[in-house]
């Protein structure tokens, strides 16, 4: 027993020396590995939220025409969404895709296709709720100092702002939805219309973007016409009107589902349909008259006109599209004609931001494509059983 007790400290010492030697050998091996060009596995430090740097957007004022507000060019740009300037990614079963996976209106691309039909039904039920809609006649019924042309100029400018900041498409569509819903309930002076636009864009950016522009950035893009306090106050007023429910199905929500489900096998045709659909959908935002149509109706009509542009000799509508969208051509006819007129420049022809945007090669220059002057009457008739 005594021998065992006396041997314990010695054994412990030997173990300690052995461990130290092993540790030293491990360090030498690691150092040798680095010297030989092999890097040891890096340990990443978890950064606390309070330690994250605040991203600032240094801006340069770009001169604009007198009737346009000032547009900015940020030096630190956010990542450009792949779905807008590259091949579409994502969603099984033609599901809507969004940068914000928690958005009710824009489910993420990881959902199970077996739920696609249920989600679409849910989104359709959301869009018909009165509290989520804007009035189709608010210019005549509510506004005194704001006209449809002023609204179109504002939306055209917001398209430029979203493009300069590389904001996702959902941000633009939500912002336009917010401003229309606000104008449906509150009369506004024309000198406050741009303030409403930046307030709506600020809320939409916070909801959709990973790194949204700051309040100061939105003050700056208006050439400091409004103070920070005014922008924050407008943001608060809009949120109260929305009752802080910022998620809403938009034209883009439904357009994603429809285009994913009807794309052709050829990559070129698929991209043309994607970009032409996005172009026509943004044009529809300019037209005050399109407010009388539900977002899903506009999205379905956009797909019709886009397919007509790509292949004018084939009926754009089919039983598959009718089943997918739930709409007959007769239910879309008025909206189809409205979007066709927009593309033919019969309306909003003096507003060029969207057309200039889609003249770029990354969008396959879809705004330069000439649409058919007339839509064949047979295409606007319901399909026979």
From Swiss-Prot:
GO terms for cellular component: cyclin-dependent protein kinase holoenzyme complex; cytoplasm; nucleus. One of its GO terms (molecular function) is cyclin-dependent protein serine/threonine kinase regulator activity. It comes from Oryza sativa subsp. japonica (Rice). Residues 1-110 are annotated as: Disordered. Belongs to the cyclin family. Cyclin AB subfamily. This is Cyclin-A3-2. SUPFAM superfamilies: Cyclin-like. InterPro entries: Cyclin, Cyclin-like_dom, Cyclin-like_sf, Cyclin_A/B-like, Cyclin_C-dom, Cyclin_N, Cyclins_cyclin-box. Residues 7-41, 74-88, 96-110 have a biased composition (Low complexity). Keywords: Cell cycle, Cell division, Cyclin.
């Amino acid at each position: 027993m005594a021998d065992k007790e006396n041997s314990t400290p010695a054994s412990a010492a030997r173990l300690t020396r052995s461990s130290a030697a092993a540790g030293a050998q491990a360090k030498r091996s690691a150092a040798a590995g680095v010297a030989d060009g092999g890097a040891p596995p890096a340990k990443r430090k978890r950064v606390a939220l309070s330690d994250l740097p605040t991203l600032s957007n240094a801006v340069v004022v770009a001169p604009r025409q007198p009737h346009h507000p000032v547009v900015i060019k940020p030096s630190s740009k956010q990542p450009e969404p792949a779905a807008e300037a590259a091949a579409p990614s994502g969603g099984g079963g033609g599901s809507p895709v969004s940068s914000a996976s928690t958005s009710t209106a824009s489910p993420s691309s990881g959902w199970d296709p077996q739920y696609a039909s249920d989600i679409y039904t849910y989104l359709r039920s959301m869009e018909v709720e009165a509290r989520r809609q804007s009035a189709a006649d608010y210019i005549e019924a509510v506004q005194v100092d704001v006209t449809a042309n002023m609204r179109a100029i504002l939306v055209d400018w917001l398209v430029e702002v979203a493009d300069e900041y590389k904001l996702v498409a959902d941000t633009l569509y939500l912002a336009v939805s917010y401003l229309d819903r606000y104008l449906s309930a509150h009369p506004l002076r024309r000198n406050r219309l741009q303030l409403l636009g930046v307030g709506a864009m600020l809320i939409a950016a916070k909801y959709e973007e990973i790194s949204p522009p700051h309040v100061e950035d939105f003050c700056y893009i208006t050439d400091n016409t409004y103070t920070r306090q005014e922008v924050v106050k407008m943001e608060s007023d809009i949120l109260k009107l929305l009752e802080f429910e910022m998620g809403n199905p938009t034209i883009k929500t439904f357009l994603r589902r429809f285009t994913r489900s009807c794309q052709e096998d050829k990559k070129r045709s698929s991209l043309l349909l994607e970009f032409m659909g996005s172009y026509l959908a943004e044009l529809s935002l300019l037209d005050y008259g399109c407010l009388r149509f539900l977002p899903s109706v506009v999205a379905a009509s956009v797909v019709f006109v886009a397919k007509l542009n790509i292949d004018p000799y084939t009926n754009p509508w089919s039983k598959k599209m009718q089943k997918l969208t739930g709409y007959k051509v007769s239910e879309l006819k008025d909206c189809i004609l409205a979007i066709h007129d927009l593309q033919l420049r019969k309306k909003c022809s003096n507003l060029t931001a969207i057309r200039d945007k889609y003249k770029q090669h990354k969008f396959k220059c879809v705004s330069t494509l000439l649409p058919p002057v007339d839509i064949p009457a047979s295409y606007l008739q319901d399909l026979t059983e």
